[in-house]
Amino acid sequence: MTISPPERGSDAKSQVEKVDNPATFELFGKPGHFDRALAKGPKTTSWVWNLHANAHDFDAHTSDLQEVSRRIFSAHFGHLAVIFIWLSGAFFHGARFSNYSGWLADPTHVKPSAQVVWPIFGQEILNGDMGAGFQGIQITSGLFHVWRGWGITSETQLMALAIGALVMAGLMLNAGVFHYHKAAPKLEWFQNVESMLNHHLAGLLGLGSLSWAGHLIHVSAPVSKLMDAIDAGQPLVLDGKTIATVADIPLPHEFFNQDLLAQLYPGIGAGIGAFFSGNWAAYSDFLTFKGGLNPVTGSLWMTDIAHHHVAIAVLFIVAGHMYRTNWGIGHSIKEIHEGQKGDPLLFPAPNGHDGLYEFLTTSWHAQLGLNLAMLGSLSIIVAQHMYAMPPYAYMAVDYPTQIGLFTHHMWIGGFLIVGGAAHAAIAMVRDYDPAKHIDNVLDRVLKARDAIISHLNWVCIWLGAHSFGLYIHNDTMRALGRPQDMFSDSAISIQPIFAQWIQNAHAAAAGSTAPNALAGVSEVFNGSVVAVGGKVAAAPMPLGTADFMVHHIHAFTIHVTVLILLKGVLYARSSRLIPDKANLGFRFSCDGPGRGGTCQVSAWDHVFLGLFWMYNSLSIVIFHFSWKMQSDIWGTVNADGSVAHITNGNFAQSAITINGWLRDYLWAQAVQVINSYGSNTSAYGIMFLGAHFIWAFSLMFLFSGRGYWQELIESIVWAHNKLKVAPAIQPRALSIIQGRAVGVAHYLLGGIATTWAFFHAHILVVG
């Protein structure tokens, strides 16, 4: 830590400015008020599309960074309000239309439902039998499992949460208006990164985790322990009363009684004295290091989760005291930046990280680009942990929820990462000043861009040719009836030795990585089968030739996505083809008339193309996950302890040919969605067709050019003129960029909804 003389600290001064900027609907009610041209009203039909395109482009409304910052800050509160309203809706459905209590009473036989379809013209067929006499639509969001983890024991509590979330939404809306129209932060407040880091690290993450750990210890852990005992058929006794049903469990506020809590966790009786005297072992019954999964619920131990949050809290509270604010002590981010001189081998930059501090505190696009890339990566990591280390009770045996959560977190991650590239490119076009980045690391990366992109291109060709080549070889050999010449576990074996080594290392490390951990980090890494209610919750995952092959397809598609996105960022300002690209802006269709062969070079077009490859990459990932789990992990446990897997372990032999993927996965598992009519999954059958249509509709926008439509429109306008019904607003074809945007939006929406219907109809029936 840098200890500086006291004069280096800055005096605290007001960071907020009182503004007289009344919130008036006179202004907001006027479409296009933010743009002089749009405010004049529509002359052509392009007006409405430009309105949509530019409404949230605050940079285009004003060049005043403080004003832009205030608008973004205010919009964040609006976003939070929408989230609270959305949460309130989820809680309300749980309170009013769900079988939550029924599910809590028998989670292995009752399916979760929080939606009941009302009969109007026969759609009550969609209400399936959820068990225990409840008819409804099965949900796959995992909310019931989360609520049980929080310690919610009744629909009444959910209704209280629904009301509370609406109150919070109101507060957020109020805050958004107040901090823009009444008391708005000054620019220096937004740029005070040390203070922001201290507050976010120590406050949001540190104290947030600590208070959550408090909830887990005082509410979640005791409620979970009592429920687990009921589910295991060995109910516990509290104050001489047997807790035989969920209704018998004390309400959260009753656990304020320390004596009551100490009956479940004697360590609570040690009080706070044990903490200050260093006798932390007294707490080892509710802050545990068990590892593995709870055999009753197939989820991580609640006391392990509480311990984790205490540890996270300590780390982040310490981290939140590292940065220099009003006192001359701690790190300065600017000094840290300027002390870094870059990588001496890869990017020897004489000026190191000089100028990056200013770039990141004046370009919110640059900041957002980094944050989206990291948050997207985090979402993808969450997807992997949902099955490898399931945190919520009974979630691991709710296969539809597991597929749903994996798919959801993968898509979210993909979109955020592409968004990261988009905002990085916008930052390069709008905010990057080459004069301020001479020979620093960013400049050196830009100077090396040809080497970076050409190498990445070579990697993509190598991965694509070899990984696809393995499949082509196998399809050819199988077609010719030569199984002995195929790449497979039983013929020419290619084992993923590095992945197997990682699995073994994790399995062997139990007991040595964490103090006295009783089990390994995940059963997926060479652990043992955990069965709950006769279904597999977790099991060791065997890896072989089929996994090796599809893994390299993943490597190929991810690298192509990175190639497209990175090329868009590195060539956003200029290229050999268009040296003055920065002057043309973030999105432009081509470099003007008379300059052919310059289409699809804008940074926006790279985002557009990157989205397709992101979709491509993740489709293969979620198909791989879905099939692998059904083949090698999920299934029912027989009386002799053997496992009957859903697809009987066919992955290793079928996933090594393209024909196998098409026939034994896509076609075989589409049986349920194609045959769903007349059953309670028929909505997915219709959705499967409808989403295919939306996907196909996108191709009309992607394959045809603007001129085709403009010609057609002019002929239609002629007919209107003939009939004297000409419109006052002149019809215009979508611009080239708008057409592509509509195309990619429908392509992704159609593709994702098709996959959703395909997964659901299948796994709801067989899972």
Swiss-Prot record:
Q: Which UniProt keywords apply?
A: 4Fe-4S, Chlorophyll, Chromophore, Electron transport, Iron, Iron-sulfur, Magnesium, Membrane, Metal-binding, Oxidoreductase, Photosynthesis, Photosystem I, Thylakoid, Transmembrane, Transmembrane helix, Transport
Task: State its Enzyme Commission number(s).
Answer: 1.97.1.12
Q: List the membrane topology term(s).
A: Multi-pass membrane protein
Sites where the protein binds phylloquinone:
W709
Which of this chain's residues are annotated to bind chlorophyll a'?
Answer: H692
Among the record's GO biological process terms, what is one? photosynthesis
Q: Which reaction does it catalyse?
A: reduced [plastocyanin] + hnu + oxidized [2Fe-2S]-[ferredoxin] = oxidized [plastocyanin] + reduced [2Fe-2S]-[ferredoxin]
**Residue intervals passing through the bilayer:** 72-95, 158-181, 197-221, 305-323, 364-387, 403-429, 451-473, 548-566, 606-627, 681-703, 741-761
Tell me, how does this one assemble?
Answer: The PsaA/B heterodimer binds the P700 chlorophyll special pair and subsequent electron acceptors. PSI consists of a core antenna complex that captures photons, and an electron transfer chain that converts photonic excitation into a charge separation. The cyanobacterial PSI reaction center is composed of one copy each of PsaA,B,C,D,E,F,I,J,K,L,M and X, and forms trimeric complexes.
What the protein does comes down to: PsaA and PsaB bind P700, the primary electron donor of photosystem I (PSI), as well as the electron acceptors A0, A1 and FX. PSI is a plastocyanin/cytochrome c6-ferredoxin oxidoreductase, converting photonic excitation into a charge separation, which transfers an electron from the donor P700 chlorophyll pair to the spectroscopically characterized acceptors A0, A1, FX, FA and FB in turn. Oxidized P700 is reduced on the lumenal side of the thylakoid membrane by plastocyanin or cytochrome c6.
Q: Which HAMAP family match?
A: PSI_PsaA
Q: What is this protein called?
A: Photosystem I P700 chlorophyll a apoprotein A1
Taxon lineage: Bacteria, Bacillati, Cyanobacteriota, Cyanophyceae, Synechococcales
